[in-house]
Amino acid sequence: GNIVTNGAYTLKDWVVNERIVLERSPTYWNNAKTVINQVTYLPIASEVTDVNRYRSGEIDMTYNNMPIELFQKLKKEIPDEVHVDPYLCTYYYEINNQKPPFNDVRVRTALKLGMDRDIIVNKVKAQGDMPAYGYTPPYTDGAKLTQPEWFGWSQEKRNEEAKKLLAEAGYTADKPLTINLLYNTSDLHKKLAIAASSLWKKNIGVNVKLVNQEWKTFLDTRHQGTFDVARAGWCADYNEPTSFLNTMLSNSSMNTAHYKSPAFDS
């Protein structure tokens, strides 16, 4: 079949796992103002490899996540080439709502409270991100969000409340909760998963086993619901809250947290 598009470019070549080549479309309505004639996209899983190929001149531009250990160094060495811009995206860990014991709201809430977002954002990643208290970014156009009470608590108070909830759910220091944390192959995702597992252990005594999968297998695992907690991320298709909220509808193909709420659906 033929792919039908209405953008400034058309598909010229596609080699799976190697490259996607787009060329300027002469039938695009604003073709006179299209500046670039051809664009080649390269799928690069490693952020370090991405940077190395950029600095060698092989890549003209990258919008990938910067390697944690190289970001500050690159900002000093090539400040005019490293840009940090606001993004309507949320990086998060999704909890399998249908799999015991994660179908217990106390367990899910404890994991939420026990994650020190300030350390992840400001110490581990340190690339200008904002700590998130919800799925939809507060600067989304039209969003009128109320910051939850717990977001104003100290991390110590969050940890105390999380431990109480875990104890109510049957998990203590003698019988700790053990979870599998799934992430797809990436230098950044691995480092963040290691940090997250360390924080959950230190803050609320949860044992975390890291599970790495390649992208296709990772997606299948999430859709099938055979995971505990998984790395996830979502970027808005358009600047409006429903771009985030619609993914949590029970019939959404993007609802890999397997969240179900008749009230939310209605």
Language model: regions and residue ranges:
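Extracytoplasmic/peripheral linker and loop segments enriched in polar/acidic and small residues
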Residues: 106, 121-122, 155-157, 206-223, ...
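Ligand-site clamp/hinge motif
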Residues: 26-72
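Structural transition elements
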Residues: 130-168, 186-191
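Short helices/loops that flank or line small-molecule/ion binding pockets
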Residues: 48-59, 76-77, 105-106, 194-203, ...
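A bilobed periplasmic-binding-protein/Venus flytrap-type ligand-binding module shared by bacterial periplasmic
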Residues: 23-27, 87-110, 114, 123
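Gly/Pro-rich hinge or "lid" segments in bacterial periplasmic/extracellular proteins
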Residues: 1-38, 160, 164
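Ligand-binding "clamshell"
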Residues: 71-84, 224-226, 240-255
